[in-house]
Every structure is written in structure tokens, then in C-alpha cells.
Amino acid sequence: MAGLEVLFASAAPAITCAQDALVCFLHWEVVTHGYYGLGAGDQPGPNDKKSELLPVEWNSNKDLYVLRYESKDGSRKLLVKAVTVENSMIINVLEHGSQQVSDLTLNLNDYIDSEHLVDFHRVYKNSEELRSRIVSGIITPIHEQWEKANLSPHREFPPATAREVDPLRIHPQHPHTSRQPTWCDPLGPFAVGGEDLDPFGCRRGGMIVDPLRSGFPRALIDPSSGLPNRLPPGAVPPGARFDPFGPIGTSPSGPNPDHLPPPGYDDMYL
């Protein structure tokens, strides 16, 4: 573990608890994987500088350690947070580029001897296991996700036009184009019987007349039919779907003469 003893010697005067010793080990492991320490805290400060040593005030808060790192080639930045919870330490690492997060929980009593904090040769227990857990739980997941993000191809899509993205656009029912369709207009009002005149042409109206599209004026339906009085103007809006109150064609003025029986219809001798 070349370099860890030198790092511990430089930080030994500030190490006063088990979590300090564990963060020192964690810092060394991150540095050996190609990173420089930048500083302490979430945000960059005026005293930030790339260094393999622990930054100033790295352990000012014994319950929450926040350290920032940058790879030697400047392509990756890490934000490391270590939270002390009773006899455990929860380590959380965020890689800014890929937003990949990894975390690891360590038991302080399993790896740190609190009785020998100033003795480098006795302070760390199971150091190989500790190193393996840091690498597999934090370093490797961060690097794998970062490499995967760089290898995946970036798909580029052409910019969408206003016609494509307008959700309120109503498609025309009969768009007028310069090129006319090869079929005839089925809505032509005078197409009745056209197929009989030109059997080899396109299909047109047959012998069944559509009363709504016959081309002749239609009688208006009186909405007041069946009522003693007429409805006031505007009671039925133009074009509204409306069922008359009574039979169509009746008039409140009285029956039509055609509706009366002929004179003497009941005289058998007439």
C-alpha cells in the first residue's frame, strides 16, 4: 500500500476518531485510482487546488465529510460524502458527468482500531478487505457507468417543424391539392344514374337517390309542429339537431280539406 503511510503521517495530527482514520483510507484509495483531491465542501472554493493530500478542514464536521475530486485528465469529477451513523459510516459518491451514484456502508469497528489511532501499523484492521469493498462498491460502478455512457452512440434527430408538433392542428377533410384524385367526387348531387350512362368510367351515383344530396331544395321542418302556438324566434338555433313536438306538416289553423272524408262516404245508395 505505497503512499498510504505517507498520507497517514501528514494527516495524523488531525485524526482524533475512527471515522477520521476511515476517511483517510478512503481518500488514499480514490487517489490511487487516478484522481486528485480538489477541496472540502459541496461548492468550489478559492483555496481549491489539485493535490494528493487531504484538503484543509477535511474533518471539520465529524458527522458529515464532503470531499471533491477530479480525474487527472480532467474528464470526471466526483463528489464524496461520508455520514457517520452510530458505529457505521455510509459513503455516497456522485459522478457529475453521468450522474451515476454509488454507495457503501462500512462498520467502523471492523476496520478501525480506535485504541491506536496514531499508530499507522495498528490503526487499520482487515485493510485488504476494506480496500476490496471500496473498489467494488464505489470505484468500479462509477467507472463502468462512465465508460458505458461514452461508448453508447448519441442519436441525433432532425428538428421538428411547426406542422409536426402542433397538437391543436385540425387535418382538412378535403384538402385542395394541385393533383386531383383519380376517382370522382361521391358527393356530387347530380351523380344519380351516372354509372348507367358511362359503365366504363369511374363509379358514380347509382339509381338510389339520397334525399339529403339530391340537388333539389328540401322542405323546411317546422319545429312548432304539434304545439298550439309557434315557438319564439331563435328558440331553435339554425342547424341544430331538433326533433319536432308533433307530426310534420300539421298546422294549428285546422285540418286540411284533403284530410276530411268525401261527402256522402257513408251513404250506401250514393
Curated annotation (Swiss-Prot):
As stated in the Swiss-Prot or TrEMBL entry, residues carrying the post-translational modification Phosphoserine are S152, S251
Compositionally skewed regions (Pro residues) per UniProt: 254-264
- Note the SS bond partners: none
The subcellular location is:
Cytoplasm; Endoplasmic reticulum
Coarse class of the primary localization is: cytoplasm
> Is Phosphoprotein tagged as a keyword?
yes
Q: Name one GO molecular function term.
A: protein heterodimerization activity
List of residues that carry N-acetylalanine: A2
Q: Which InterPro entries match?
A: PI31-like, PI31_Prot_C, PI31_Prot_N
> Keywords for this entry?
Acetylation, Cytoplasm, Endoplasmic reticulum, Methylation, Phosphoprotein, Proteasome
Residue ranges of region Important for homodimerization and interaction with FBXO7? Answer: 2-150
Extract one GO cellular component term from the record. proteasome complex
On subunit structure and binding partners, the annotation says: Monomer and homodimer. Interacts with FBXO7.
* PANTHER family, A to Z: PROTEASOME INHIBITOR, PROTEASOME INHIBITOR PI31 SUBUNIT
Q: Which family does it belong to?
A: Belongs to the proteasome inhibitor PI31 family.
Q: What is this protein called?
A: Proteasome inhibitor PI31 subunit
